[in-house]
Each structure stands twice: as C-alpha cells, then as structure tokens.
Amino acid sequence: MAEGRGPVVALVPAAGQGVRLGENKPKAFVDLGGTTMLTRAVDGLLQSGAVDRVVVIVPEELVESTRSLLPGHVTVVAGGSERTGSVRAGLAVADDAEYVLVHDAARALTPPSLIARVVAELRCGRRAVIPVLPVADTIKTVDVLGAVTGTPERSELRAVQTPQGFTAELLRRAYAAADGIATDDAGLVERLGERVRSIVGEPTAFKITTPLDLVLARALVEEGAH
C-alpha cells in the first residue's frame, strides 16, 4: 500500500447537550479534573503527534467562549444541532486535509497512542479505520413493543470508538451522499460499499454519556491515569 504524507485534520463535533449526563450545560463543557472534557479531547489529539490541525465544531453561541478555552491554533467554527451538520461544517474548513479524523469530545480520555495508531493505518493506505472493542454483554434485537426478535452472535459484534479515520475524499463523498442524520461516520462510508478497517481500541476511550460514566472518568483523572 502507498504511504500517504498529506495533512491530517481532526474534527471534534461538540454540540451535544448532555441530557443523559444530568449536567446543566453542553456535555463537552462539563468539568473533568479541573478542565473541560473538550479541552482534554483536544489535548489528546495534539499530544498524539499524528494530527496536523484540529477543528472544533460548537453551537454558534459558544464559538467565542470555546476559542478562549483552547490553544490559538485550534480552529473553532459553528455547526449544526446534530452531528451530521457539525461534521459537514468541519469539512468545509478542512480543504487542506488528505486525511480526516472525526472524534467525540465526550471520549475525553482517549489515549494519544490510539489516535496515532488510527493515523498510521491511514498513512499505510487504509481508506477508513475505526477502533473497536469486543462486546461483553449479550445483545438482543427487539421490536417496537419490546419483544425480542433475535440474538446476534456476540463474537461478531464490536463496540465502536473514536477517532474514526478516513481519507478526506472518501468522507466528503460519504457526506455528499448522506440523507438524514447519522450517528456513525463509518456507517455512511459503508453505504458507499467501501471497506472499513477495524483496529483494537482502548478501554479508556469510552464515551462519557451517563452520570456513572462521569464518576468513572473523574476517578481515573484523580488517580492520575490521565
């Protein structure tokens, strides 16, 4: 596979309201060890040594306050109320990118080494790369009434993390073809019939979504794990 040397731009959609988290503020701005989740997520990208530029996408009313939180070389732009619109807004200011990472601000403790591994796969010629972990629980499919309709084979299931990495050309094409709202960028790429490569993720790259997640994240920070 040909080795790519072009710029890597990381997009960080940060418009989530954090309703399930139980905090009275956007999720990305919740305190985590004396700083925000967003700041920690951006720091991880920068510390990886694999990212050339970071673009953070927030609601329009938070653009200026977000800029004051982050290093001056981080680009902050206004995005949509949903993830899809935010990623599109980020892509619009990433014209220089050969590769694009899309990273959840709520995965604030993602190790820089995982980010670097995703980029390494892209530079080795992969067009779409996602970190994953095996699923510990048995998963059921259910209908609208809650009746169980099936039990997928657990050995074939994986929980997907971020950053998800793509060639910029492929991700732009996937978003151009997208209709409606998507929660997973790789899913849009799959719709094009493209192959998505998975690599082993990291337990600490979990998404901070519930109050219990936040307790765990704060405990890890307090213990010096991050």
UniProtKB/Swiss-Prot annotation:
Top-level EC class: transferase
Documented EC number(s): 2.7.7.60
Keyword flag Transferase: yes
Keywords, sorted A to Z: Isoprene biosynthesis, Nucleotidyltransferase, Transferase
Site (Transition state stabilizer): 20, 27
Any one GO biological process: isopentenyl diphosphate biosynthetic process, methylerythritol 4-phosphate pathway
An MF annotation (GO) of this entry: 2-C-methyl-D-erythritol 4-phosphate cytidylyltransferase activity
Reactions it catalyzes: 2-C-methyl-D-erythritol 4-phosphate + CTP + H(+) = 4-CDP-2-C-methyl-D-erythritol + diphosphate
A Pfam family hit: IspD
Site entry (Positions MEP for the nucleophilic attack), positions: 154, 207
Keyword Nucleotidyltransferase part of the UniProt annotation: yes
Pathway: Isoprenoid biosynthesis; isopentenyl diphosphate biosynthesis via DXP pathway; isopentenyl diphosphate from 1-deoxy-D-xylulose 5-phosphate: step 2/6
Family to which this protein belongs: Belongs to the IspD/TarI cytidylyltransferase family. IspD subfamily.
Function: Catalyzes the formation of 4-diphosphocytidyl-2-C-methyl-D-erythritol from CTP and 2-C-methyl-D-erythritol 4-phosphate (MEP).
Protein name as annotated: 2-C-methyl-D-erythritol 4-phosphate cytidylyltransferase
Taxonomic placement: Bacteria, Bacillati, Actinomycetota, Actinomycetes, Mycobacteriales
